[in-house]
Every structure is written in C-alpha cells, then in structure tokens.
Amino acid sequence: MNLIPTVIETTNRGERAYDIYSRLLKDRIIMLGSAIDDNVANSIVSQLLFLQAQDSEKDIYLYINSPGGSVTAGFAIYDTIQHIKPDVQTICIGMAASMGSFLLAAGAKGKRFALPNAEVMIHQPLGGAQGQATEIEIAANHILKTREKLNKILAERTGQSIEKIQKDTDRDNFLTADEAKEYGLIDNVMQPEDK
C-alpha cells in the first residue's frame, strides 16, 4: 500500500491541500525514493525541467533513497541534471545504490551530500540475455559498452582512475557516508550542526 501524505497550506486566500511531493516541489525539492524505471525517470526529468523553467538560477535539491534500477532510465535523469542550467544538489538519505549512487555523484561539484548514516553502493551494471547465441553476444557487447561508459563518467565525477573504478565496481561495494566522501562520490557528510 502506497500512502502519500497530504499537507494543508493556509494563506490569506484560504486553504489548499497538496500531496507532500507537490509541496516539496514548491521549495525546489525532488524526492527519488524508489527503484528507477522509465516512469520514475520521466517524473524526475519533468520536475527538473519544470524547476529550471521557473527559475534557472536557483539550485534544485534532489534527495535520493534508491536501490537503483534501469540504466537507461538513470541516464535520462543524469543527462538532464548535466543539461539544465541550475545546479542540482544531491543528498543521500538512507541508501543510494547502483544507479542511485551514480545519480548521487551527478550533482554539482561541491554540492553532493550524504547524511551520516547513509550508505552508498557501487557495482557494475546488471543484465541478462536469452535467445540465440548471436542475440546473447549482442547483449553482452552492449552491457560491456554500458559498463565502460558508466566507469568513464564515474571516474570523471569522483577523480578516481578508470582502473580503480573497474576494480571497485566488479562486485557490490558498500561505502559509509565518510567512505563515499573519501572516494569522491560526495563532497560532504551533513552533520546535525549543519541544520
């Protein structure tokens, strides 16, 4: 069951009810709190474009608590973050795994954060293939190219060498918030005194 809280806002013109995500959007906050698929990506991309159209100078805040998901859907979000004019601050709450960690690293340099108990997990892309040998070979080549592209971007975003990224993403690699900072996936760990 998916419950979405409603908030009531009172102004001099009366009361208005919002779902919590629409209310947060008014403050330029986007929440990525699920696995990443095409529907989630379309929603995030639409919100990013909307906020850019509203004000192309003000930062956008993308909160991430995601196990990851579709690589192509994730690239749609990543490319939009890189394309739009406003800086996107990324904040990991809970877990940013797989494509979630990739999007965490996609934030504006100096504006990528994690809460103290957040976890980040990086690994190579997952895929599967079935069918004739030729189709399996095509799928295998595609996932290898995708891995190469992801590793190249992660190396650019973190300052790590491609060789280190390849080694560190060969299997699931879990990092604490402090380790993610040391690795270059984020810039700072938010502390309670940062409120």
Swiss-Prot record:
Its EC number is 3.4.21.92. The active site is at S98, H123. It comes from the Bacteria. It is found in: Cytoplasm. The keyword Disulfide bond does not apply. CDD domains: S14_ClpP_2. Fourteen ClpP subunits assemble into 2 heptameric rings which stack back to back to give a disk-like structure with a central cavity, resembling the structure of eukaryotic proteasomes. This is ATP-dependent Clp protease proteolytic subunit. It comes from Staphylococcus haemolyticus (strain JCSC1435). The lineage of its organism: Bacteria, Bacillati, Bacillota, Bacilli, Bacillales. The gene is clpP.
